[in-house]
């Protein structure tokens, strides 16, 4: 199934969090928090401005982003757990 977000929404796959610290301590599942970092899977065409023109989004598929702790709505697409969020929920793009 192919999914295309509408408007200024982006589809994000969370980046898996490390299960072991740098010091070698294994973090149990009960102590883990969901990561606030992910990879953009798909983007919508953009939001409309006051004149009715579509303004393209600043993020694109493949970007690694940071987002707020409570951002987005969890969805399942092709068996994958993903998030749909507005571009305004994206805090920034992680550049390598």
UniProtKB/Swiss-Prot annotation:
Induction per the UniProt record: By heat shock.
Record has DNA damage as a keyword: no
Subcellular location: Cytoplasm
Entries under SMART domains matching the protein: Cpn10
Primary site of residence: cytoplasm
UniProt-listed InterPro entries: Chaperonin_GroES (IPR020818), Chaperonin_GroES_sf (IPR037124), Chaprnonin_Cpn10_CS (IPR018369), GroES-like_sf (IPR011032)
Keyword Cytoplasm: yes
GO biological process annotation, one example: chaperone cofactor-dependent protein refolding
Keywords of this entry: Chaperone, Cytoplasm
GO molecular-function terms, A-Z: ATP binding; metal ion binding; protein folding chaperone; protein-folding chaperone binding; unfolded protein binding
A GO CC term assigned to this protein in UniProt: cytoplasm
Role according to the record: Together with the chaperonin GroEL, plays an essential role in assisting protein folding. The GroEL-GroES system forms a nano-cage that allows encapsulation of the non-native substrate proteins and provides a physical environment optimized to promote and accelerate protein folding. GroES binds to the apical surface of the GroEL ring, thereby capping the opening of the GroEL channel.
Subunit structure: Heptamer of 7 subunits arranged in a ring. Interacts with the chaperonin GroEL.
Family: Belongs to the GroES chaperonin family.
Name of the molecule in the record: Co-chaperonin GroES
Organism: Caulobacter vibrioides (strain NA1000 / CB15N) (Caulobacter crescentus)
């Amino acid at each position: 199934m192919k999914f295309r977000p509408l408007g200024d929404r982006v589809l994000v796959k969370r980046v898996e969090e490390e299960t072991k610290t740098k010091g070698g301590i294994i973090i149990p599942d009960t102590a883990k928090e969901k990561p606030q970092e992910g990879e953009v899977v798909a983007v919508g065409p953009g939001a409309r401005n006051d004149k009715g023109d579509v303004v393209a989004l600043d993020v694109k598929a493949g970007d690694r982003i940071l987002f707020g702790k409570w951002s987005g709505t969890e969805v399942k697409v092709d068996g994958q757990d993903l998030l749909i969020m507005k571009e305004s929920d994206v805090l920034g793009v992680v550049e390598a």
